[in-house]
């Protein structure tokens, strides 16, 4: 008989503990949801800020591309001039050898 009287007590304790845990889980899920919303807003703001720099990045890219093009052209011109000088020196040596 004592088992039957203690059984409702155990059930009540279990139900109270279950309800407390469910409430705690619910509170924690609400906190997680709030934090996810905050994170989402922050990511959206970061994306917007990044978009504001697209024009600046494009401008710098154009600048660097132009500078690289100038450097490449300068190297080609220098190489062509060196080849002309080298071939001119070779012709002078050949002419001197003939004399």
UniProtKB/Swiss-Prot annotation:
GO terms for biological process: cell division; filamentous growth; mitotic spindle organization. Keywords: Cell cycle, Cell division, Centromere, Chromosome, Cytoplasm, Cytoskeleton, Kinetochore, Microtubule, Mitosis, Nucleus. Its main location: nucleus. Residues 89-99 have a biased composition (Acidic residues). The keyword Membrane does not apply. It is found in: Chromosome, Centromere, Kinetochore; Cytoplasm, Cytoskeleton, Spindle; Nucleus. Component of the DASH complex consisting of ASK1, DAD1, DAD2, DAD3, DAD4, DAM1, DUO1, HSK3, SPC19 and SPC34, with a stoichiometry of one copy of each subunit per complex. Multiple DASH complexes oligomerize to form a ring that encircles spindle microtubules and organizes the rod-like NDC80 complexes of the outer kinetochore. DASH complex oligomerization strengthens microtubule attachments. On cytoplasmic microtubules, DASH complexes appear to form patches instead of rings. This is DASH complex subunit DAD1. It comes from Candida albicans (strain SC5314 / ATCC MYA-2876) (Yeast). The lineage of its organism: Eukaryota, Fungi, Dikarya, Ascomycota, Saccharomycotina.
